[in-house]
Design a protein with these regions (language model features):
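An acidic/histidine-cluster motif and surrounding catalytic segment
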Residues: 1-71, 75-137
Length: 137
């Protein structure tokens, strides 16, 4: 199935006080050509930042109907392809992962993946993502 990512709502997670990050991610999404950009208020948990991040993703999943793409507010677009081909039975597609997750390919607890073709990866274990396309509930 071919998808034009620009036609899918771009949902970004952002803490209300992080105005600079908000401006940065909106600029990134505008430059990529997204037509519908939606902000979800991130959860601030200073003692448990990973829990706050996870809960923020959970909030986004419950506030917006699929299909949509979730972006974290610190992501950057590198080699952004506007049209992608994905399997028809996909429920979710990781569009980008952080450098922290990628540095441990097949060797650590962060991320394990297999390169299927031309940058399309099958993810086996993921703890760090910067954007995820959700196609179904």
């Amino acid at each position: 199935m071919n998808l034009d990512l620009r036609e899918i709502p771009a949902v970004y997670i952002n803490l209300q006080q992080d105005v600079e990050r908000k401006n940065s991610i909106v600029d990134v999404l505008d430059e990529c050509g997204f037509e519908n950009i939606i902000r979800v208020d991130g959860e601030y948990t200073p003692d448990r930042p990973l829990a706050g991040c996870s809960y923020s993703h959970y909030k986004a999943l419950n506030e917006v109907d699929p299909p949509f793409i979730i972006f974290e507010d610190d992501c950057k677009a590198k080699n952004f392809r506007t049209i992608i081909d994905i399997p028809d039975d996909s429920d979710a597609v990781y569009l980008g992962i952080s450098s922290w997750g990628r540095m441990n390919s097949h060797s650590g607890p962060c991320v394990q993946y297999e390169d299927l073709n031309g940058g399309l990866l099958r993810i086996y274990n993921m703890l760090s993502a910067h954007s995820v396309l959700y196609l179904d509930e």
